[in-house]
């Protein structure tokens, strides 16, 4: 992948398909499954360009997958997950040190019948060594929560991500796939049941963090 100096691609990031069916978001529900060593081991062996893989750590086999990926120099990252504190801690112990699209398609504080239950978000905040990635377009994650991420995780623990689609920087008349629409500065499923990705470019993220979330330009 890096043989041509004019195409210095650092690696591939896989998002799916070992995800929580309850947190599918815009992922295809029928493709979601538990980790299968017979499937993922040949992929890692045959494609050393894979450098990061998004996984829900609560799935059966996810801890074994995280340990395997870490041994191969691949970063297992938490995403599309219903994990609670114990799941996140166990994941962290086997190599899940990063969170993809923090707050999006993951559990937060919720009720389980009459009891309260922490979610992935609160659990990640409690682990100092876990870094997060946020889609900082001001829509995927509201401004007050962007402020909270920066306040708790800081500049060293936070990465900005566009999650940009091929229609990034386009207008509402640009996207032709009938499954999606562009509306109010973001891509959505056509039935508006979930966000489907961003149309933001990195400069928009920087402006959002500086002008609305109060982060210094240097830190942003």
Regions found by a protein language model. Name each.
Residues 1-49:
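Divalent-metal coordination cores built from histidine and acidic residues
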Residues 14, 69, 99, 209, ...:
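Conserved, mostly hydrophobic/aromatic
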Residues 20-21, 34, 108, 167, ...:
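Generic structural "secondary-structure junction" signal
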Residues 36, 40, 62, 202:
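Aromatic/hydrophobic pocket-lining residues that form the small-molecule binding cavity
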Residues 40, 146, 206:
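Generic structural marker for isolated residues within well-ordered, non-membrane alpha-helices
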Residues 45-169:
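Active-site core of metal-dependent hydrolases
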Residues 116-134, 150-162, 168-220:
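His/Asp/Glu-enriched, well-ordered alpha-helical/loop segment
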